[in-house]
Amino acid sequence: MGDSLLADRRALVTGATGFTGSHLAHALRAKGYHVRALVRDPDGANAKRLAEGGIELIQGDIGDAEAIDQAVARMTHVFHIAAVYRTANHSDAYYERINRDAVGYVLEAANRHGVERIVHCSTCGVHGDVAEIPANEETAFNPGDVYQRSKLAGEMLAQEAARAGAPVSIVRPTGIYGPGDDRFLKLFRTVENGTFRVFGKGDIAYHLTYIDDMVDGLILAGEHPAAIGEVFLIGDDSYTTLDGLVAEVARAVGVKPPSLHLPVVPLMLAATACEFACRPFGIDPPLHRRRVAFFTKARAFSVDKAKDRLGFQPKVPLADGIARTAEWYRQEGWLKGSGKTAA
């Protein structure tokens, strides 16, 4: 599809060198948008791939208000995807600067330059450990760590701007996965080599979103008239359990799923000790409490609002998405198995 169809639509994507942002930038370009990406290092491999796809690069840091202002200039759409995710060696102030303050810079610049549509990417994590499932957009906030708290603070700025009349839409994704992302690689590898262990009962709810569906949801939030001023959870049609997720991964890598379940309390104690031991040295600990949350925190959400108001329809079921992800890992040389299902 050429530029002629949407030649008047110019979209800035922040976080475009990351997993979700890169997929979104290429999808918008394929739709005919002129796409601009704010990147720290134009010579980096991810930035070069964007440029090869016809995406304009502008150098700058998401924590720099002046750089954001320059990037937003002459844009009709802004998709704010950039964030600092869960790593244990960043200070709380760093999370706040990137996940909260930068949102304010984006909103101010968008207002100053008359941007037509703004999509702010938040997280389902603002709801924390969900007590009643499936949760929805009205479920109480319950952030459980500095990442979730800082993302909630950023979302509050976006909600405030929307109440003041800014053309803002807010998306809260469930866990995003798919080819191009390595966050779930450790899970796939340890399931394949037989070293993965389930801590706890394995019956906690787990909700994912395949990357293509996530991109569809973000674009709908930036184009559909009914999205303005609204918040939408975006995810798969249905959720699973941790045991269900592990079983799908095992099927995709051709092994039997683990049957042993270990108590989670000793793991949490070890994570706490590891975190405190590493922090004075600025080391990212191999085990920390946020990783233990993988086994303990329920994540299950309704996406009915996005389906009803935006026409959002997830297209890639979990089994297909996990299989595609495993195949990509295999092509990258990160998995050893053939992918044939174990007998």
For the regions a language model picked out, list residue spans one by one.
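N-terminal Rossmann NAD(P)H-binding glycine-rich loop of SDR-like oxidoreductase domains
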Residues: A11-K31
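Substrate-positioning beta->alpha
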Residues: R149, A153, D181-K186, F199-G222, ...
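Short alpha-helix in the Rossmann-fold core of NAD(P)-dependent oxidoreductases
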Residues: I98-V103, V119, S150-K151, H207
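NAD(P)H-binding glycine-rich loop region in Rossmannoid oxidoreductase-like domains
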Residues: G44, I55-D101, A109, C124-D129
